[in-house]
Amino acid sequence: MYLYIETLKQRLDAINQLRVDRALAAMGPAFQQVYSLLPTLLHYHHPLMPGYLDGNVPSGICFYTPDETQRHYLNELELYRGMTPQDPPKGELPITGVYTMGSTSSVGQSCSSDLDIWVCHQSWLDGEERQLLQRKCSLLESWAASLGVEVSFFLIDENRFRHNESGSLGGEDCGSTQHILLLDEFYRTAVRLAGKRILWSMVPCDEEEHYDDYVMTLYAQGVLTPNEWLDLGGLSSLSAEEYFGASLWQLYKSIDSPYKAVLKTLLLEAYSWEYPNPRLLAKDIKQRLHDGEIVSFGLDPYCMMLERVTEYLTAIEDPTRLDLVRRCFYLKVCEKLSRERACVGWRREVLSQLVSEWGWDDARLTMLDNRANWKIDQVREAHNELLDAMMQSYRNLIRFARRNNLSVSASPQDIGVLTRKLYAAFEALPGKVTLVNPQISPDLSEPNLTFIHVPPGRANRSGWYLYNRAPNMDSIISHQPLEYNRYLNKLVAWAWFNGLLTSRTHLFIKGNGIVDLPKLQEMVADVSHHFPLRLPAPTPKALYSPCEIRHLAIIVNLEYDPTAAFRNKVVHFDFRKLDVFSFGEEQNCLIGSIDLLYRNSWNEVRTLHFNGEQAMIEALKTILGKMHQDAAPPDSVEVFCYSQHLRGLIRTRVQQLVSECIELRLSSTRQETGRFKALRVSGQTWGLFFERLNVSVQKLENAIEFYGAISHNKLHGLSVQVETNQVKLPSVVDGFASEGIIQFFFEETGDEKGFNIYILDESNRAEVYHHCEGSKEELVRDVSRFYSSSHDRFTYGSSFINFNLPQFYQIVKTDGRAQVIPFRTQPINTVPPANQDHDAPLLQQYFS
């Protein structure tokens, strides 16, 4: 037994040293420096060394002995800085060992690979000591980043896996969705940089079910010494629930790094195929180690993963995904075999042998090696292929769950986060911009893009077509468009967010008079300035919460501009009374079309289009409906207006209106659960009612409907905001106006067709309702009850002003002269008619 154990230790040490040498050989000087010095920086703690912080920071790695590189570093510190590192006290040191895991040292390691480091520590560290060690690791991450090396540390309590503890979703330890599978990956890929050897490798595979008993036997026989080994526990059976959660996690990762994740996703699928008795790959590698079969290029974990997936896909006769996984493997290794190299490293030898076995020709190698220059057609083909493979894995996962009557044990929060990211990335919805380049090619930019509009009544669908070439009709006719949509906004967004459209792209447009080149260029500049291409991935917290609008652009009059009709015309209007929503004598709305472009907290990009007289109302309702009342306000809201005339005024007015409505939507509280805003559009009054759960819109034909709607929609504490329309008032009303109070004036029409109502708010802004029918008394009662329910304050946006109850008056005629009396009271002294005409002369604006 002793000789057997010693032989195993020698093999284990030899494999470990081979992996260390390979990790260093594959990388540049900065990586080599970081990789070599990390154990030293964790073993010692000194103000002159990176990672230092005040406090009782745990330091010292069990059985640490500096190698030649580390001794040289320590000697330099002592020689040039006068520092003599103090060895930690003797005995059991706090850090059990330092290990890399993942692709490091394997054929899958590339020049851009990061480092995942497990810092395994004694379970007797208290919370404060663990926190200090975590802070030191964070400082070391920053130090490595300053050298251009990405390092991620994970503190691992040596008893963590025995107690089935899990981290939270978001790190490489991937939350509660993996446990045995995480340990499986660690055992098959770990490289010991310093500290104790890993005990699991010494236990034969046929003793796995009795792991703890076998280990205790080795200790009892004196073959192994307990404090010389890191013992994270055995690999118990894999539960269906854990497989389900781990597979979802791999799909989650595949969104951002598809080539890297496909291989792991298919490994999990292979495990499920063998369920309930899967051959975990770590056990496979250990069996080879015990048998002395150092195959697969030195038991390279990446090659063995490919070998297992190949066995599975061959067995189920799936050549399509087998070809894909081989290409993913080739691209991950990143050795361009079609290009000659002066020095042939071990990774190149491995890949050359595999490619020869696969029967690939030079044309395929050249195509794959040219991946950095792939453009949209190749990228979209690759994206669809990757998506098909991932969805096939997902379907197989669902079948697996049904077959095993699965009750998912992963926490509901983790599953919710995973499924929401899958939904955000893969769900195809109208108006949603599909992002087709998740790290497939670094540059999709096009030198030329042409937008062509096809009007209704033609052979092709009406709408917009995008081509990646200049508008030479021969080339356009002979090529399929890259993308089609009914609305230009969606095409521009698709081209921008997928990287085809850059500042260097030459734009062309055949817009049939709808959109010309200057307008297109202006829109592209606005969108590119407002929306950054790349943002950090959404956090698990964001994915667990309802999606919220983060960046919003409201694009006004891009495709239909009512002000274009003003060209070469004289238009009469009063600047003081100009209302862009009910403009001029005909009360036309100057907003003809609205396009929404927004990015939400799940990093989805969406577009919507509205046109016609009610575009503003519909767009407002849609925007506000996508904001739940507890949502954070958008980070930015921009209005881009492309009107030929009155552009600045329209933009400002829309910006004010949208900001006001967003504030009303998000500022209501449970104590003040509803708010109301009236808006006049194209001569019609619309009411927006802000309730706890939604925003409703109602057309208000007359005062009875207007205030009946208030009464019907109001809840306790309802506040009112009225968008008034400046109109010519009877002189008697104009003269009786008083700032600071709300005034209602009733006037009989004299033709038995109801009555008129003139309403003045505290600022004497007026709104008029003609030919109203119904009970004035009921109206007065409802309005009085409404205002009195608001207590003693009137809310106007976020500011407060003094509140007075409304005053009600009746306009009567005495001796042919109009006068004002309080409603339903005895007449008061006659008020002489105002002798001032407040109407200014009509102004003219000539548009050319």
Curated annotation (Swiss-Prot):
Keyword Repeat: no
GO cellular component: cytoplasm
Principal location class: cytoplasm
Nucleotide-binding keyword on record: yes
Reaction equations catalysed: ATP = 3',5'-cyclic AMP + diphosphate
Region of interest: Regulatory: 541-848
Localization, UniProt: Cytoplasm
Top-rank EC class of the record's enzyme: lyase
Location of region: Catalytic: 1-535
A single GO molecular function term of this UniProt record: adenylate cyclase activity
Record family assignment: Belongs to the adenylyl cyclase class-1 family.
The protein's name in its UniProt record: Adenylate cyclase
Organism this protein belongs to: Salmonella typhimurium (strain LT2 / SGSC1412 / ATCC 700720)
